[in-house]
Amino acid sequence: MRRGITATALVAALALAATACGSDDESGGSKSSGELSGTVTWWDTSTVGSEDKVFKKIAEGFEKKHPKVDVKYVNVPFGEAQNKFKNAAQAGAGAPDVIRSEVAWTPEFADLGYLAPLDGTTALKDQDDFLDQAAASTKYKDKTYAVPQVIDSMGIFYNKKIFKEAGVEVPQNIADLKTVSKTIKDKTGKTGLYLRGDDAYWFLSFLYGEGGDLVDAKSKTVTVNNPEGVKAFKTVKDLVDSGAAKTDATDGWENMQSSFKDGKVAMMINGPWAVADTLTGKEFTDKANLGISPVPAGTAGQGAPQGGHNLAVYAGSKNLDASYAFVEYMTSVETQAQTAGELNLLPTRTSAYAKQEAADSEIVQFFKPVVETAVERPWIPETGSLFAPLVTEYTKVLTGQTTPEKAASTTGDSYRKLLKGWK
C-alpha cells in the first residue's frame, strides 16, 4: 500500500525529536537473565486517527507481556518514512529498532544493508503459516529481512445511497464507469469518481487493466512506455476530461477521503487500509451504506496491485532480542485476528483467516480473493523508487500538462537511468 498521507508531518516530527531511537545506547537491553528489557522504538506508518490507535494499543500489550521493555511508538507519515529511515540509517543515528516497511521498501532497505536478517530468529515464528504472496516481499538474495504484517489490494468504494438515488449498478469496466458517473451527475449533481492524482499507486489498476506493467524484472526490460502504458495514461486522462472523475494534484488522500465521506463523490478507488477512516464519515454512520467492488476492468481484464506492509528490524539496533520478540508479537495469529476485527485489515497468516474476527469481517472476506489474484510488483531494490518519476507524469497527464504518449516515454527514460543496464 502506498497512501502518501502528509497531514501529520508536524506531529510526527515533534515526536521523533523527543523520542529515543534504536541506534542510541539507551535502547540497549539484555536477555542474559532470561527476561527481555530495554527500549524498542517502533516507527509505524498507519493512518492517523483510526489505525494508529489500534496499533498503539496492541504495542502496549507487548509491554504488559514484557514489563521491562519500553516500546516507544512513533507514527511517521507514510510519505516521509522511506527517506527518513534511509537518512537515519545512513547516518547511524536516529533510526528506529523496528519499522513498518511498505512491501516495496523492504528489498531496497535490505540491499542497502540497513536491515537485520531474520532467519533463525524468534521474529519468524511459524514461518510456514505466512501466505506465499505476502512472504515474497520479505526476501532478498535468499535471506529474510522482514515479517509480513498486512497484505492488501484495491477496489471501488461506492456510496450505496447515491447509487440507489441515481438508479445505477456497480461498474464492471471502464466504459461502465463513465456511463455510471454521467448518470450520477445528471440525476444527483454529484461527481461519480474521485481519482487520486498525487500518488501513482492509484494508476496501477489502470495499467494492469490494459495488460501493462512498470517493468519486466526477468528480462530486465522497462515496459511502462509500451502501448499498454500509453493506453492506461489515455484512460485516466479521459476519465477526468470527460467529467467522470475529479482529481487534485496535491493533498490527494485528504481530499479523496473527505469528498467520499461527505457524499460529494459517489466512488473512489481505495484499499482495506481506508475502511476504518471511511466509516467515520457522515455518509457512513450506517456502515451498510459502504459498498466495495473489484476495480473496473480495462481492455485486458481486471487488475489490481498487491500491496501491504512488513515489519523489519534495523541492523544497527542495540536491542535485537527485544526487537525480534516485538515483531513476532505484532505479526502473531492473535494480533492479526485483532486487526482484522477492529480495522478490517487482511492477515498475512493463513491460520488467522480461520479466527472469528477475520471470518466476521465482510471487508476481509471481500478482499481475500482480490489479493489472491492481485498483481505482484517486482521485488527488486529499485521498486520503491519507481513511483517518483511515475507520479510526476501521472499528475501532469491528469492536469493537462502533458500527453499520455509523452508521459509514458518520459517515465520509461527515467526508469532506464535508474535501472542501469536495463532495456
Question: Where are the regions a protein language model picked out?
Answer:
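A structural signal for short loop-to-beta-strand junctions that line the ligand-binding cleft
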Residues: P96-I99, D126-I162, T191-G192, G291, ...
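Periplasmic solute-binding protein
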Residues: T106-Y114, A134-E169, R196-K218, P305-A312, ...
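Long, aromatic- and glycine/proline-rich binding clefts that accommodate carbohydrate-like moieties
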Residues: Q133-S137, L290-S293, A340-P389, K396, ...
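Conserved C-terminal helix/tail region of periplasmic/extracytoplasmic solute-binding proteins
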Residues: K164-A166, D241, E372-K423
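Extracytoplasmic/periplasmic substrate-recognition and gating elements
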Residues: E60, A166, K234, D238-A245, ...
